[in-house]
């Protein structure tokens, strides 16, 4: 089972395309939708939905995957639910760059301080990070600096922030999922 979390643009047709691409790894891909506008409520909702899916799950090696803001959530929810994560161009600093787009961007900073201390150290090697060199929305070098000490970084030379085509990375994701 692969759980897919969309980014800030929840209505993007690219979400459906990514789900279809992920089905080459596992036919059971589940899109979990969330508001993107209310961080604390989103966190509660995502934890509840992912936990529900895991309770009914038969896959011994489930995976959670997210793009952009979905990558922010996939890393945290995956850690809290003890499943491996794959994140594409994760928005690591939404409290800095979501101002004017969501109601309370400062809630992201609050969530970060309330999360498990040094959670990335405790999550070491359980997240695969795929970054675009041509991310027009986020500073991928800053993301790499923050994540490289803990996770493997794979660089993509073609895609932009929304990462429309993930197919060149499917074999690597499948291998990572298999490690479970």
Curated annotation (Swiss-Prot):
InterPro entries: AB_hydrolase_fold, UPF0227, UPF0227/Esterase_YqiA. Signal peptide: none annotated. Belongs to the UPF0227 family. This is UPF0227 protein YcfP. NCBIfam families: PRK04940.1. It comes from Salmonella paratyphi B (strain ATCC BAA-1250 / SPB7). The gene is ycfP. SUPFAM superfamilies: alpha/beta-Hydrolases. Pfam families: UPF0227.
